[in-house]
Amino acid sequence: MAKIISIPDVHGSHKWEIVKSIPQDNYDYIVFHGDYFDSWENDWPDQGENFKAICNFVREDTEHRKLLIGNHDFSYLSVTKYGHSVSGHQHNHSTEIKNLLKQNLDIIDLAFECDGWIFSHAGFSKTWVKFIKDIFHSMLDNFTDEEFNIDFLNQQWHKLNHSNKEDNFCYSFHKLLDWNGFLSSSGNEVTQGPLWIRPDSLLSDAYYQKQVVGHTELCLFEKVYLHQNQNQIIFIDSKTHEIFDFINTSEEYNFMTIPEFNNWYKKTLKIINDIKAQLIYHNDEENFVKESLNHHFSKEIAEKIYKFGFM
């Protein structure tokens, strides 16, 4: 059993700093799920200083604090012809960001595993894992499918020369980590890798049956638990990139199907928006909001919605 704090896409936000005040005895691991750059609110150089602070925090205890890479980070490292232009929104700072990432590649992983749960930026599909295994078979001596696991994948990632596009292994690996879609502009294809894949495709083709991911902003006020067949995925990212409660690897969570989630999401969002639309008619806004939320939701849920949606 492990208690894990999963920190969703950062995008320059300082919200992660709340974990610095949590006693180490209260958790087993802290996992950063990537996307440290490309903020639409926080400008440069604060984004760079924020990333340095995150790296320093992780280096204080690399055994229990894990730093994973996201698509917005990898776009600055890619050696392929088009990879660097896919999600890099700060071309005027690309050299500085690339240097910061390279200086800390020794602590940046692709994924983390704990008690059968796989933590990554976006998730692993069967289709993508087959692609990467094919590369390993063709370019690594004596590789067997049985060798493939998260530790092995991270080891190969750390062996890459992230500056040499003439290195065939590095180029092939990077190409698979780049945007790898053909039909969808959002990344909703099973061919997409662990930095890009979206919920529908991940749930239908998950390589690991238990995964925790960021990347897609599904959450309103709490983590989202979705399942399809035997696949169970916990989604942790929201539009405001809030940090939610611990993930307990021994706990049984209530998972929804995508249709169930869509219905719940629309209904919940309508209630929240209706309450916000009525605020101009009430002098005591706080009391009105709390009473309205308590009318529609349990006390626990109402408190969470108030905290993340109205404060």
Task: List each language-model region with its residue ranges.
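Binuclear metal-dependent phosphoesterase catalytic core
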Residues: 217-283, 287, 303-311
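Active-site environment of divalent metal-dependent phosphoester hydrolases
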Residues: 12-17, 38-40, 72-78, 125-127, ...
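Active-site-proximal loop/helix segment associated with metal-binding centers of metalloenzymes
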Residues: 117-203
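Core catalytic region of metal-dependent phosphoesterases/phosphodiesterases
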Residues: 7, 12-101
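Short hydrophobic beta-strand that contains or immediately precedes a catalytic carboxylate
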Residues: 6-8, 69, 119-120, 213, ...
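Catalytic phosphate/metal-binding cores of nucleic-acid and nucleotide-processing enzymes, i.e., regions
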Residues: 37-41, 67, 193, 197-210, ...
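Beta-strand-turn-beta hairpins that frame and shape the catalytic cleft
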Residues: 1-5, 112-118
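Intrinsically disordered, low-complexity coil/linker segments enriched for acidic/polar
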Residues: 284-286, 295-298
